[in-house]
Amino acid sequence: MHTFKDSLNITVSSGSGGAGCVSFLRERFKAKGGPDGGDGGRGGNVVFKVKPDLKTLSFYKNGQKLAANNGKPGMGSRKSGASGEDLVIFVPPNTRVYDVFTDSMLFELQNFDDEVIALKGGRGGLGNVNFKSSTKRTPRFAQPGESGTTLDLRLELVLIADIGLVGLPNAGKSSLISTITASRSKVGNYPFTTKVPHLGVLKSSYEDLVIADVPGIIEGASRGMGLGFEFLRHISKTKILVFLIDVASNDFMSTYSILVNELSVYDVGLSSKKRIIVANKLDLEGAIENFNQLKRALDGEKVLGISIYDNRGIDELVNELFALSRI
């Protein structure tokens, strides 16, 4: 299971160019040879590149400072200095890069082969061989290298999953994802146990499905209440939604309306996605009766009943998810 670092800030710097060289040709029988100082090398670029097997931003630390290498200085005999090595920052697909100070998105890396040069390294300085003229036969100066540049960036990962698991706090999402996948999401009997999105993988012999355990939605989440809309965007690109409803609670009938409303307010497209309504906690008193009432009220919706406690309905749910993914 991966715990998602949804957003972090880093500071990146491109390399400075190497200084040009002041040098003069020295050969036998030529006591006063002409200038032969080479140019400095280019500073390293800052490059962002998608790495397909990365799933999180956790390879980097919040506030980390990263820099490309500087170019090497020029040398005699008109030899140029070596270019500085580029700083390559590998990120998962669907990573957005923002300027911290302007809060503007600079670029987005979506596909496996995406690559962006965020900062170019400084140019190398010209060696003194470039400044020889009819009036300056022996130039004793060269250019310094151009300084590199620095940017404070915010990286944001838009979580991509096949299935988005949504529900009110304490509906049992973390327990469900732990049951049907190999993940072990933090489980506890209090609201907002899941503070960040988690991923789990449903495996079969022919297909894997990634399921996102998204923090609990509350009424008003689309306006930033509770854990807010920052987590709603994580399910914006999923193919299937699973609405998990605690049918042992007194307000189980209103839960469906709250979930649909909050998703619709945030993004009207979310409410039209393929979905399954899953009634949880069938092992508790009164839950079966409530489940039947929910099915009657939501005629036309796919409504399944489960109990994580005694594994009731789990296999049927998993099979239904695989079937729905192929439609």
UniProtKB/Swiss-Prot annotation:
Q: Give the UniProt record's GO annotations in the biological process aspect.
A: ribosome biogenesis
Pfam families tied to this protein: GTP1_OBG, MMR_HSR1
Q: Which SUPFAM superfamilies match?
A: Obg GTP-binding protein N-terminal domain (SSF82051), P-loop containing nucleoside triphosphate hydrolases (SSF52540)
Give the subcellular location: Cytoplasm
Identify the main location. Answer: cytoplasm
Q: Which GO terms describe its molecular function?
A: GTP binding; GTPase activity; magnesium ion binding
Keyword Hydrolase among UniProt keywords: yes
According to the entry, every stretch annotated as the Obg domain falls at 2-160
Q: EC? A: 3.6.5.-
Cellular-component GO terms for this entry: cytoplasm
- The residues that the entry says bind GTP are 167-174, 192-196, 213-216, 280-283, 307-309
Q: Which residue pairs form cystines in this protein?
A: none
The lineage's top-level taxon is: Bacteria
UniProt keyword annotations, A-Z: Cytoplasm, GTP-binding, Hydrolase, Magnesium, Metal-binding, Nucleotide-binding
Q: Which amino acids does the record list as binding Mg(2+)?
A: 174, 194
Q: Per the entry, which co-factors are needed?
A: Mg(2+)
EC top class, in one word?
A: hydrolase
What the record says about family reads: Belongs to the TRAFAC class OBG-HflX-like GTPase superfamily. OBG GTPase family.
Record-linked HAMAP family: GTPase_Obg (MF_01454)
State whether it acts alone or in a complex, and with which partners, per the record.
Monomer.
Q: What does this protein do?
A: An essential GTPase which binds GTP, GDP and possibly (p)ppGpp with moderate affinity, with high nucleotide exchange rates and a fairly low GTP hydrolysis rate. Plays a role in control of the cell cycle, stress response, ribosome biogenesis and in those bacteria that undergo differentiation, in morphogenesis control.
Q: What is this protein called?
A: GTPase Obg
Native organism is: Borrelia turicatae (strain 91E135)
